[in-house]
Regions:
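Surface-exposed, glycine- and small/polar-enriched segments that build interaction surfaces at terminal
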Residues: 1-226
């Protein structure tokens, strides 16, 4: 599209055809493959920069449906390697705010709302066929001159007739080795107080208040856990 010296730049639009009875037209853009020693071609989608206002946005959306079917799926997938290399990475990173007083951009992953059940959010580490499976790490941001960020894991309140969601922390089971450990620890302090650990059960207005149960593991071949 054309540049605009004193106004807006020109619009570039690529649209597949609509259909009244059949499937709408498809739109495909593919970078070139390489059958030799070179890398396959890259595909880049960039929104426009702005020197005086906000940069342009990039929106990728799947289609809606009104006829009882599922909405279109959106899949982001990195490439597979079959010749000794690692699989491709997928990185989702929000923008940095470099000027004084500005914040970094937020990254939000939200499952869809449903008239019956809400959608799930699932995060899995990769399976390791010959070695350890992939790790899942949730790390808050560091503060270079002030406090680091917090991590909050919480289920929301229930409606009038429901039960609030449960929180389950569990390590894995093993058939031939030791099962995974579960550790909860607060941070050390060099010049101040060490962090506290608080375990609190809920009050009960009508029924019994919540209990705390700590049970050591059983063993069939040696002493039970302490």
């Amino acid at each position: 599209a054309g540049d605009g010296a004193g106004g807006n730049g020109g619009l570039a639009s690529l649209t597949a055809g609509s259909s009244n009875n059949g499937a709408g037209g498809a739109f495909a853009a593919a970078a070139g493959s390489s059958t030799g020693n070179g890398a396959g071609g890259a595909a880049t989608i960039n929104a426009g920069d702005s020197s005086n206002s906000a940069g342009g946005a990039v929106s990728i959306g799947a289609g809606d449906t009104t006829a009882g079917g599922a909405g279109g799926a959106l899949t982001l997938s990195s490439g597979t390697s079959t010749a000794g290399g690692n699989g491709g990475d997928v990185a989702l990173t929000s923008g940095r705010g470099t000027a004084a007083g500005t914040d970094g951009g937020h990254s939000t992953v939200t499952a869809g709302r449903g008239a019956q059940l809400g959608g799930n959010v699932q995060v899995f580490g990769g399976v390791g066929d010959a070695n350890t499976g992939g790790h899942v790490s949730v790390v808050s941001g560091a503060g270079t001159s002030t406090s680091s960020g917090s991590i909050t894991i919480k289920t929301p309140d229930a409606g009038d007739a429901g039960i609030s969601g449960a929180l389950v922390f569990s390590s894995g089971t093993t058939s031939s080795g030791s099962s995974g450990s579960l550790s909860i620890g607060s941070g050390h302090a060099v010049g101040g107080k060490g962090g506290a650990i608080t375990v609190t059960v809920g009050d009960g207005n009508v029924g019994t208040a919540g209990a705390i149960s700590i049970t050591a593991g059983k063993s069939t071949n040696t002493d039970g856990g302490a």
